[in-house]
């Protein structure tokens, strides 16, 4: 995400005809188990080489640092596309497993064993210059073409044994000389293994003319980091200055890139093979990938509903207990309010959601302090008598409709504070399982005010001057930015 400024909304605003496909570019290694064994051995070696002296830990790095670095970086990129609904499910499984503590170190990792277990419905290609076939070139080029070819053929056959004809060798076109050495070796290995090829373009921005935006955005990421100060001339000023073009291309544009870069690098290819690889890319998208959508159905836990009961019945029972506990069962206004709220909750099918939130709240209270709740959930009498919140909405004149409307389709937010969120998360995982408890992910966007200041810093504009005009710039730029980027 750090250098990615392309998404479907921008593609649509540019008037592009395209088909979005669910997939990932994963970090792949041959064997997570073997990698872990080697890594643990390196860590043991490092530990044994540390010597205590003068209250300092002195380390002899000469025999371990390079080896450790190689092990940490022993990974390759792999493009994995979901072919159908089953494939999407398997893709989710792979991503989840790659983030498991057993497979995660700095990066999520997956290996042949994981791919074999969840291969159904997936299409895989060998990715870019950081892919597994490219690694065969980088790791063996000093030993000659024969060694490179053997490694590539072995790797292709290993993937074919898992995915069959759903594995593709991937070609890319740019002005980097090594890319063409890799391409030639991939073409040779694909011929030996009867593996189909695709031509692809790494895509990081929507149109050719927006490369400056991406390059500037990339440089902003280094502001304040331990990198040398960048001057304005670090940014490429012309498309011709780029070693590679990172925007989506149609078939004609891919062919043009191939012809231009192969001529520029003085490399001869079989035109028919390349033309077929471009067509194959189209076939994958429009013939091999089904039209499907992620199943966004919310699946709440069943254990909150006792055997022989329904979610509605259990919610009624708990609310009745809560009314009696607080002494509200004899107060007509409270009884009427609880009936109204329960009717809305049941009509929307949210009973199990409230039972789940009560279960989480109850578990939290066993180990730590829990706040009274905040936000519109404080307007729910049901939440109060269940013990989810600690505020009586009738006492303070709080409206249930601010929390949950009769026509609501999404679950309402119920926010409450706990003294130790991480401890609660660990407790819930231990009680209910790591496959059923996940934190919420947040994606933050750059705000215009901070973006103006970062860009000004990059160009060396004094902050006092920037502050004088920031408000005016925001007022003038916001409408245009929203129109351009959504």
Please report, for each region that a protein language model flagged, where it lies by residue.
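Alpha-helical scaffold/interaction cores of sigma-54-like transcription cofactors
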Residues: 1-486
């Amino acid at each position: 995400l750090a250098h990615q400024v392309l998404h479907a909304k921008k593609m649509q605003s540019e008037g592009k005809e395209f088909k979005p496909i669910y997939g990932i570019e994963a970090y792949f290694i041959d064997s997570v188990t073997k990698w872990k064994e080697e890594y643990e051995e390196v860590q043991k070696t490092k530990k044994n080489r540390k010597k205590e002296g003068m209250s300092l830990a002195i380390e002899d790095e000469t025999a371990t640092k390079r080896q450790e670095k190689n092990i940490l970086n022993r990974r390759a990129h792999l493009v994995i596309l979901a072919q159908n609904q089953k494939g999407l499910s398997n893709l989710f499984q792979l991503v989840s497993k790659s983030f498991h503590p057993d497979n995660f170190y700095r990066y999520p990792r997956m290996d042949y064993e994981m791919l074999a277990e969840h291969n159904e419905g997936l299409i895989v290609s060998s990715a870019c210059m950081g892919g597994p076939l490219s690694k065969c070139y980088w790791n063996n080029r000093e030993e000659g073409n024969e060694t490179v070819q053997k490694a590539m053929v072995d790797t292709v056959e290993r993937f074919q044994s898992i995915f069959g004809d759903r594995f593709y060798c991937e070609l890319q076109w740019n002005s980097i000389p090594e890319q063409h050495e890799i391409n030639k070796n991939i073409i040779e290995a694909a011929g030996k293994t009867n593996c189909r090829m695709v031509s692809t373009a790494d895509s990081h921005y929507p149109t050719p003319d927006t490369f400056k935006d991406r390059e500037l955005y990339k440089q902003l990421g280094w502001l304040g980091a331990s990198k040398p100060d960048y001057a304005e001339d670090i940014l490429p000023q012309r498309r011709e200055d780029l070693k590679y073009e990172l925007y989506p291309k149609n078939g004609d544009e891919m062919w043009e890139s191939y012809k231009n870069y192969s001529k520029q690098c003085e490399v001869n290819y079989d035109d028919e093979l390349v033309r077929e690889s471009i067509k194959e890319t189209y076939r994958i998208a429009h013939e091999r990938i089904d039209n499907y959508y992620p199943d966004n159905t919310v699946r709440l836990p069943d254990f909150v509903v006792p055997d022989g009961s329904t979610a509605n019945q259990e919610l009624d029972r708990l609310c009745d207990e809560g009314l009696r506990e607080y002494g509200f069962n004899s107060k007509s206004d409270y009884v009427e309010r609880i009936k109204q709220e329960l009717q809305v909750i049941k009509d929307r099918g949210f009973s199990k959601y409230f039972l789940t939130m009560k279960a989480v709240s109850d578990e939290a209270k066993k180990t730590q302090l829990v706040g009274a709740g905040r936000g519109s959930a404080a307007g729910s009498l049901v939440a109060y008598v269940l013990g989810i919140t600690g505020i009586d909405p009738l006492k303070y004149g709080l409206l249930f409709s601010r929390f949950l409307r009769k026509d609501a389709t999404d679950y309402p937010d119920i926010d409450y504070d706990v003294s130790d969120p991480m401890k609660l998360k660990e407790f819930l995982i231990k009680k209910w399982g790591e496959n059923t408890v996940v934190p919420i992910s947040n994606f933050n966007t750059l705000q215009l005010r901070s973006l103006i200041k970062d860009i000004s810093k990059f160009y060396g504009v004094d902050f006092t001057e920037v502050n004088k005009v920031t408000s005016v710039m925001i007022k003038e730029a916001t409408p245009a930015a929203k129109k351009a980027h959504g």
